Structures are given as structure tokens and as C-alpha cells.
Amino acid sequence: MTDNTVKALGRAYGIMAAQLPNIVGTPCRVQMANQWPLRGLGDGMRYMISNRKLTPEVDRAIRDALDGVDDMDEDMQALPIVQQGMWELAYMQGRCAKILSDGEYLRERLKAKGLTMEQAAEACEVSKAAVHSWCAGIKPIPQVRRELLAERLGILI
């Protein structure tokens, strides 16, 4: 397993542990996930779903954490100690990560891609004020506009 994969799995598990600290975040489960990250990710997702904590915002945060993972193979041996340390650091980053609302996420993705609200408004065929109200959290983003954002700008909400 590559180092980037280990870090992504650690961050994703940290996000889940922040949502369910008494179940996913217990020391024995964290230690198990540290040694066998794929098993930990699967168990964490199972607990998130069964406890109804997998909201769209949390799902998006986990999806973004796992974005760019190229290989996910796990053998019967635990991770080497160096990769366990990498996993632990990424776990703490995920544990402290803020779960963004739809508007905050849109604002962050526009900033990351170097796009302005005018460009987003043009892509969605709405006014700049409408995009501003989405980013400010005043109004929810309609499903049709979410699809346009995904299609034209590559922003999945």
C-alpha cells in the first residue's frame, strides 16, 4: 500500500471517528484501523450507516479524503511501523477536520479552482446573487444547479 493511500485512509477514518467517538473512536478500534486500514474503513462505514451518521456532508468529506487513492490492497500482515505513524498523523487531521455545509464546500471548491462567483453563475445560468446566497448558506443549491456545477466546472456537491 502506498503512503498516499495510507494517509487518505487515516484521514477518512479520523472523519468517521469525529462523528462517532464512542464507537469508531475507541482506542481498540483506532489501533485496529491503524494496523489494518481497509478493515478499519469498512468497519467505520458500517457503524456510520447503522447509526445514521453518514449525512451527505460527512459522505462528501470522506469522498474527498479518499480522492486520488490509487491502490487499496491489504495483505494479512499489519502495516509497517513507519506507515502506521503516517496513518496516525492523517487520522488526527481527519479527526479535527471541519465538515463543510454545501455552501461552504462550494465556496472552498471555487477558491481551489481559481474561479469567481461570476464564472459559477455563468456556468449555472443564474445571477451572481444566487451563487452568493448558496455560498452564504441562505438558500440551498437546487439539484439542477448541482448537476450543472458537476458537469461544467467539475464540482461535485
Give the ranges of each region predicted by the language model.
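Residue-level detection of the helix-turn-helix DNA-binding "recognition helix"
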Residues: A136-I138
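Intrinsic-disorder/low-complexity detector
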Residues: M1-A97
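A short, Lys/Arg-rich alpha-helix, primarily the initiator
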Residues: M92-K113
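DNA major-groove recognition helix of helix-turn-helix/homeodomain DNA-binding modules
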Residues: Q143-I157
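The alpha-helix within a helix-turn-helix
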Residues: L110, A121, A150
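Short alpha-helical DNA-recognition segment
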Residues: G114-S133
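Alpha-helix N-cap/N′ positions at the starts of helices
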Residues: G40, S101-Y105, V126
